[in-house]
């Protein structure tokens, strides 16, 4: 069965103009689709247009031209249906310090017009692992719990699409891991996830497909696997018995560096060199190789390659 598009964007353009001579193109004829049930990563450096895109989805920014459909509804013609179809989790943690998670969710559900008989507050608290803290003041929650409470607030009207805008900013590694486990569980229950993050490793691990924006333009849109296959270089690290300087060595397709731990790092182009040949280069320098390890490129390498200009 073919899945429908959760979000469809066609020729989306947003221009912020102070006057005819002073304008900024935040989004330039953007075309993309987010498929139902996927985790979709939206990446880009600061000023790439990510926040503008999310604000257009949420209805807080008016586009200049183009079309945007959310769950089959046009953002201009059906704004109420669009807002009912999407939940936005903002970057900033903004919670009433003296309200409990249960009270905050009940208030949020009321703002969305959800009848009391249709509210699923307890279910949502369990989904984000906050059922034990349901009656605690929100000020007493840890940073990770507050982030999960923001997700819970975005879910009170049971939207099929959840947008996470930098959800792990300022969260430590353990809490970040716990947060992503909750997001994955929501996705398994059928929620379509759109996420922005500056932690590229997270995007690589979490996303089914990734779009990369740069200066308002879409520079890549593909599966995570296909994006990683764009990397043409690989790194090999040698632990040797004494430090040698190879940085002045000029060999086409090889790039040398070293550190004070007697390690030599060589980045090489896969289609030009074999590992055996690189090992022989090190041996010919008269050193003993103690250990060898390799590193494949990651999403950060792709990101830098696509946005460096």
What are these regions (language model features)?
Residues 2-9, 15-29, 79:
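A short, flexible loop at the N-terminus of ABC-type nucleotide-binding domains that lies
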Residues 158:
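Conserved catalytic motifs of ABC-family nucleotide-binding domains
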Residues 162-165:
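Catalytic Walker B motif of ABC-type/P-loop ATPase nucleotide-binding domains
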